[in-house]
Amino acid sequence: MAIPKTAALPLGYTPAGGRSYNALGRNVKGVAAQRAISDSMAVTDTAVARSILDTLVAFDTTSSRSNLALIEWVENYLAQFGVQAERVANEAGDKANLFATCGPSVAGGVILSGHSDVVPVEGQAWSSDPWTVREAQGRLYGRGVSDMKGFLALALAHVPRLAKGTCPVHLAISYDEEVGCKGAPAMIERMAASIPAPRLAIIGEPSSMRIITGHKGISVFEVRVRGHEAHSSLTGHGISANMVAVEIMAHLSDIARKLEAEADADNGFDPPQATLTIGEMEGGTAANILAGHARFVFDLRAPPGVDTAAVLAPLRDQCAALDAAMKARFAGTGVKLTQIASAPPMTPDGSDDASAFVRQLTGENAPASRVAYAAEGGQFQQAGFPTLICGPGSIEQAHQPDEWMDLEQFEAGARFMDRLAEQLA
């Protein structure tokens, strides 16, 4: 089904606070986009979702920025259909989660969850403006179309129908998923305390509409090394922070190889082993100066059942030994290892009830699978919600320049939401 071109949606809106924004979050004089959406309900939900996607993508919600403009837009959109939302803000007050119940407040509902933040575009060679959805050759291009504003747009487009159902859908929108799943826990805790027990939680990460019942957990660490500067020809007169950092990184590589050799090849994950990768590194000021500082960040992604504390125990011992040896030579030097983020794995629980329900929505009978990336599924599962992942688009098309989603996937996501609305009517 082609997406009707007549469903274009005005992006300006005027929230209750009196400020006017365009979808970029800049103050403008606009019309109420929520009213425009209401007027467009005569066209297909897919077309409405496509218009909402334009709006959501145009908000720059890179994890380093505030997401409040997007959250306010969603609040006002939901309010038009009588759906009241609750914010769960961060300590600084510049970001917020949002959750809302469409339909009656009764047990047995479905959580639809997605994150509002996206990865940066800086340093990437985009063919067009990443904050404007471009349609070409059967694809939708733009930052977040696949991961995961496409899913959010589809869910929001179906709110008018979901709000009239006899069984609730609980919408959950988080922040800071891309930097260690930091935002969702506070929202999940609040939801667990305030909504009747749901049947399941569906995390709409891009899975090509396949059912995912397991994902790896993630732990992110920062290593800072403080050296003692001296001329690089006088190595005994100082300590190069870079050389110490390289020694620690070499140990990480050894641990990674050991994990690969000991992995359970039949655990359903690809790759099957827990992985260690270094994503950031910096240090030193000049080639002829023993580096006074060094810093690097690494992550550990482990499948369920891996004792991550045991995996990293040798590294902690090494850092402690290096720290003591450096301090014995020069005061103020040393090594500091800090965990800066973590999220648990999602473990297949052996129950087929949730998967069977979602198969009715996807229309596919393919067996459930597992993925190597981390997501918020494990956090929902730890709160006692039966949880799985299913969403349009592919993780292989996310996080890269010209991020894209097949129109066929977007339409498959719309059919999924249509069937959900029918099931809960």
Where are these regions (language model features)?
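Short, positively charged low-complexity motifs
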Residues: 9-10, 34
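N-terminal, intrinsically disordered charge-dense segments
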Residues: 18-37
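Acidic/His- and Gly-rich active-site-bordering loop/insert found
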Residues: 40-145, 164-165, 394
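Metal-dependent amide/peptide-bond hydrolase catalytic core
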Residues: 44, 91, 222-425
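Fold-level recognition of mixed alpha/beta catalytic cores in primary-metabolism enzymes, strongest
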Residues: 137-140, 145-146, 150-254, 270, ...
